UniProtKB/Swiss-Prot annotation:
It comes from Chlamydia caviae (strain ATCC VR-813 / DSM 19441 / 03DC25 / GPIC). Its EC number is 2.3.1.234. Fe cation binds at residues 110, 114, 303. The gene is tsaD. Required for the formation of a threonylcarbamoyl group on adenosine at position 37 (t(6)A37) in tRNAs that read codons beginning with adenine. Is involved in the transfer of the threonylcarbamoyl moiety of threonylcarbamoyl-AMP (TC-AMP) to the N6 group of A37, together with TsaE and TsaB. TsaD likely plays a direct catalytic role in this reaction. It catalyses: L-threonylcarbamoyladenylate + adenosine(37) in tRNA = N(6)-L-threonylcarbamoyladenosine(37) in tRNA + AMP + H(+). One of its GO terms (molecular function) is iron ion binding. Its main location: cytoplasm. This is tRNA N6-adenosine threonylcarbamoyltransferase. Substrate binds at residues 133-137, 166, 179, 278. PANTHER family: TRNA N6-ADENOSINE THREONYLCARBAMOYLTRANSFERASE, TRNA N6-ADENOSINE THREONYLCARBAMOYLTRANSFERASE, MITOCHONDRIAL.
Length: 344
């Protein structure tokens, strides 16, 4: 079975082809640059860009893989969660291809696909597993009873960790997106220079808004207000702030995991999303948890269509096809957090 995957949940327009064995034949991603000037994603610009470049992105993927639309057996497309306009462009484009080529189509959950990306490149993953999604828009933990079953354990109550990194990068005068720039700065700084506290939200949930505010006050001063301009910082100060922030942000997640892992009796951990590529985070998890850890390669950490095609193929073969695919900005998973309480 040859599966064509389409991804457009945010600002990446992507197309990939995955063969019958799950091997990636092509993985083309167009990253929009228009948002850099605004310091974040402008939904209307993102939608227009998807509409403009989807045909050429699909054409590039077909050429790279050496196949034609007639060779495709299945079309998989991201339909939730994400920016509603961007999702609508992708879903309708996929429906057009499916109708024109008379191929079956299946909708894929973007967050679940991020976790599947880690599974896709791994071998002999044992279940049940803990799925940890860490991206610009989502921070959540899942019980994965198998590669296709996701039950919500906990999530961020406010900002996602990737979004928090981008906002702190802006405080430090860094361009968007700022995650990798924070990581680079932090490698030259002292993580104990500032005493930023990890999240203290009880139970399985997380919070990053307090940490974000603490960093802002550390830069502006405690007596500042919203109109107080950001001061000029030396490179050494930026590095120390970045390192201290990074430690607190990732510790907020890592400190929760030992108790959760014990509660759900998981046998492995799958980590997905753009933030999963952070080496400091990877090492922290390895030092915190005595379980097999699986991270996607860097090309599959960020938004891509290979993970959409891979998961879509598995869902189709498992007869879990989506009837009536519609774009949906938010998705509500079955939650099992109540059954895990109390957690410290």
């Amino acid at each position: 079975m040859l599966t064509l995957g389409l991804e457009s949940s945010c600002d990446e327009t992507a197309c990939a082809l995955v063969d019958a064995k799950g091997h990636i034949m092509a993985n083309v991603v167009f990253s929009q640059q228009d948002h850099v000037a605004y310091g974040g994603i402008v939904p209307e610009l993102a939608s227009r860009a998807h509409l403009r470049v989807f045909p050429s992105v699909v054409d590039s993927a077909l050429k790279e893989s050496g196949v034609s639309l007639e060779d495709i057996d299945l079309i998989a497309v991201t339909h939730t969660p994400g920016l509603i306009g961007s999702l609508a462009i992708g879903v309708n484009f996929a429906k057009g291809l499916a109708i024109g080529c008379q191929k079956p189509i299946i909708g894929v959950n973007h967050v679940e696909a991020h976790l599947y990306a880690a599974y896709m490149e791994a071998e002999n993953v044992e279940f049940p597993a803990l799925g940890l999604a860490v991206s610009g828009a989502h921070t959540a933990m899942f019980l994965m009873e198998d590669p296709l079953t996701y039950k919500l354990i906990g999530k961020s109550r406010d900002d996602a960790i990737g979004e928090t990194f981008d906002k702190v990068a802006r405080f430090l005068g860094l361009p968007y997106p700022g995650g990798s720039l924070i990581e680079k700065l932090a490698s030259c700084g002292c993580e104990e220079s500032y005493s930023f506290s990890p999240s203290k939200v009880p139970g399985c949930d997380l919070s990053f808004s307090g940490l974000k505010t603490a960093v802002l006050y550390a830069i502006k001063g405690n007596n500042s207000n919203s109109r107080t301009p950001l001061p000029e910082l030396s490179e050494a100060e930026k590095s120390d702030i970045a390192a201290s922030f990074q430690r607190a942000a990732f510790t907020s997640i890592a400190q929760k995991l030992p108790n959760i892992v014990k509660k759900i009796s998981c046998r492995s951990i799958l980590v997905g999303g753009g933030v999963a590529s952070n080496k400091y985070f990877q090492n922290l998890l390895k030092n915190t948890l005595n379980l097999p850890l699986y991270f996607p390669s860097s090309k599959l950490c960020t938004d891509n269509a290979a993970m959409i095609a891979g998961l879509g193929r598995e869902l189709f073969l498992s007869d879990k096809s989506t009837i009536g695919i519609h774009p949906c900005a938010r998705y509500h998973w079955e939650s099992i957090s109540a059954s895990l309480s109390p957690l410290p």
